[in-house]
Structures are given as C-alpha cells and as structure tokens.
C-alpha cells in the first residue's frame, strides 16, 4: 500500500524527521542485534545505558553545554517543572515571573503556592502579541530566580534578547524553541522543556541545570521524585525513565548534528519562517498577529478576521494534506508550527495553498 505523509503543522506532539522515524521502524523489533526492541529493554542494561549516555553527549555537543551543568531526562513534561522549579530553587520564597503567555502564567500560578511570586512584566494587555521591554525590570532584591517562557507556542512570540535579571538566576522554559538555534547555556541557571514539540515523542522533559543549584535544600514537603539532586545523582535513572522517549530524542540529536548542528538549523528555520511571514505581510486576506520584532520562527499564528472563513480554511487545508493548522482554543484563527523537522517544501506548500485560498475568497 502506498504511504501518504501529510504536512503536519501541529504545535505538539509534532512532526518528527522522517529519516528518524524510518530508522526507529527498522530497529523496532531488533535493536542493534539485541533481539529485542528498545521498548522491551531493561533500563539497567548495558545497551540502554549506552543509548542514554550517547543521547546526553550528543545534546551536550549540540548546545556546547559546559561541564558544570547537568542534563536530566525527566518524566512528566513541562508541567511537572512548573512546581519542581520553585520547590528546588525558592530558598527565600520569592521569585519573579515575566508573563508572556498561557504557559508562563500557569508556571506563575504554580509558584504562588510555594512562595511570593511576582509578575514583574506582562504582555497580557494586548493578548500576549508582543514581548514586554525587559531592559530595566523591577527585579525583587531577594528573588531566588527570574522566570521566562522563551518562545510562546500559542501566541507566536519569542524573546530575541534575554531579560536583564540584575544578577538573578534566569530560568527558561524553551519547550517550543528547544534546539531551533544556538544558545549560550551559561546565561541560564535552568533551561528546560517538554520534548514533544521539537525533539521527540511526548511524555518527557529535558532539564539542563547548573550544578550549584542542585542541593538537598528543597522546600519542606517536596516529593522525593521532584528533587533535582535525586535525578542528577542517579544519571536520570532514579526510577525507570521514559526509555523509548530518550532513544527517540537521541536519534533526533544525531539527525540535528547531521544537518550541520544548530547554526545550520537556525539558518534553515529562518528561511522557512521568512517565506511564511513575507506572504502574511503582503496578503490581502491573511494577517499575522504578532509585533514584527517579537515574531517566533517556530510558531506562526495568523487570522483572516472572519471566524467562518478561518474554519473554512482549516477544513480545506486539511483536505489538501496540510493538517493541524487550527489555532489554540484560547485564541482561535490559525497557527502553523514549523519546527526543525518541518521541511521547506511543507512551508512552500502551505503558502501556495494560502494564495489559492485568497484568490477564491
């Protein structure tokens, strides 16, 4: 039977490199002569230990992660980190949050359970369509950290310049821009993200944390499983990890290295985004919703200005093999998530379809 792959613009779980999926399919029943699938393998086996260590090393190579940072492969996605971060870092019970979307807001609300969380900047006044000025923030003198969501999946905004945290630890949720471009890890105390947008299958988060932030000194009542030290000391093997997820992430890391690393990946991502934004800026029918200087190269929201026409577009696009273009339920309209694994041809096909739709409507 002839297989037909669609162009999948889902925000997550999202498109994975076809090459990676084919490799995984080939190894599904017999991983490198072991006679079993990685899914069936003991997480304590030599074979799995090699998968885990190789995945970590490849990630370190891609991001140039210094030796004084630990890489943790943790279950629970990004949501679990909303609580883990204050539980591990809120020594003074004070933290500052920059609210640029729904996920930063959820993390902020979670932190309020554990201490005094302050919203020191927000773009909610204009439906999170821009990144607030973060050059002179009212950072709390006793803040344990300053928190951002670096790329906003729902609203399509991105911090292109990191906030001035006035010497405080910067914590960043990079779920939807992870490995989309190079980043200087040393500017952060913690970088973390759910992997299901740009790296692998759902069910896991990667946490990159500076060693001095990993201590026994967590908030009273912190569950054992949510202590970073437990996972760091056990090399992400405190309990059975998401072993197949780690294997798939490892495959994606190798694929990214093969593409030329994150410098090359960034160039390709910018090229894809430019094709879509250039069309949106010249279109009579479609409009982008984000302030130009704050646009994400990963998530591109757009509207026609007519809800019925939006719905018609999404339906007809799906019939044309361009799927998951419906915007998040909180904002409506459309959104094209054009992660690393989205080929250039997919973005070109979307723009051609949009032009055709514009002519007919």
Question: Can you annotate each of these PLM segments?
Answer:
Residues 286-317:
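Conserved PLP-binding catalytic core of the aspartate aminotransferase-like
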Residues 17, 195-277, 291, 360-361:
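Active-site C-terminal subdomain of aminotransferase-like
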Residues 12, 111, 122-178:
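Active-site phosphate-binding strand-loop segment of PLP-dependent enzymes
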Residues 5-56:
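A glycine-/small-polar-enriched, mobile loop at the entrance of the PLP active site in fold-type I
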Residues 1-6, 319, 328, 332-361:
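PLP-dependent enzyme catalytic core of the Aspartate aminotransferase-like
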Residues 79-144:
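PLP-dependent aminotransferase-like
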Residues 34-81, 88, 102, 110:
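Conserved N-terminal alpha-helix of the aminotransferase class I/II PLP-enzyme fold
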Residues 171, 185-196, 205:
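Conserved active-site segment immediately N-terminal to the catalytic lysine
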């Amino acid at each position: 039977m002839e297989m037909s792959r669609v162009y999948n613009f889902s925000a997550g779980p999202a498109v994975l490199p076809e090459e990676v999926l084919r490799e995984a399919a080939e190894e599904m029943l017999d991983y490198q002569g072991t006679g079993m699938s990685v899914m069936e393998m003991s997480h304590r086996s030599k074979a799995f230990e090699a998968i885990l260590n190789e995945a970590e090393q490849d990630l370190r190579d891609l991001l140039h992660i210094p030796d004084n940072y630990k890489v943790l492969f943790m279950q629970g996605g990004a949501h679990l980190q909303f609580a883990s971060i204050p539980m591990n870092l809120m020594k003074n019970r004070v933290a500052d949050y920059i609210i640029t979307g729904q996920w930063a807001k959820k993390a902020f609300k979670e932190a309020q359970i554990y201490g005094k969380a302050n919203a020191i900047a927000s773009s909610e006044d204009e439906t999170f369509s821009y990144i607030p000025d973060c050059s002179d923030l009212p950072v709390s003198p006793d803040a344990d950290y300053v928190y951002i969501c670096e790329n906003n999946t729902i609203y399509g905004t991105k911090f292109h310049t990191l906030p001035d945290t006035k010497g405080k630890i910067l914590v960043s949720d990079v779920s939807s821009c992870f490995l989309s471009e190079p980043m200087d890890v040393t500017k952060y105390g913690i970088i973390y993200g759910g992997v299901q947008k740009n790296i692998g299958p759902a069910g896991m988060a990667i946490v990159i944390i500076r060693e001095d932030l990993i201590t026994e000194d967590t908030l009273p009542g912190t569950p054992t499983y949510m202590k970073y030290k437990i996972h760091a000391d056990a090399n992400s093997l405190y309990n059975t990890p998401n072993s197949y997820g780690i294997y798939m992430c490892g495959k994606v890391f190798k694929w990214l290295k093969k593409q030329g690393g994150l410098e090359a990946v960034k160039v390709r991502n910018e090229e894809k985004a430019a094709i879509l934004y250039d069309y949106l800026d010249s279109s009579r029918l479609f409009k982008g919703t984000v302030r130009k200087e704050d646009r994400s190269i990963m998530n591109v929201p757009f509207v026609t200005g007519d809800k019925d026409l939006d719905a018609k577009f999404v339906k007809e696009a799906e019939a044309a093999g361009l799927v998951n273009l419906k915007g998040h339920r909180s904002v409506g309209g459309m959104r094209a998530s054009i992660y690393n694994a989205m080929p250039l041809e997919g973005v070109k096909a979307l723009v051609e379809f949009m032009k055709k739709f514009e002519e007919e409507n």
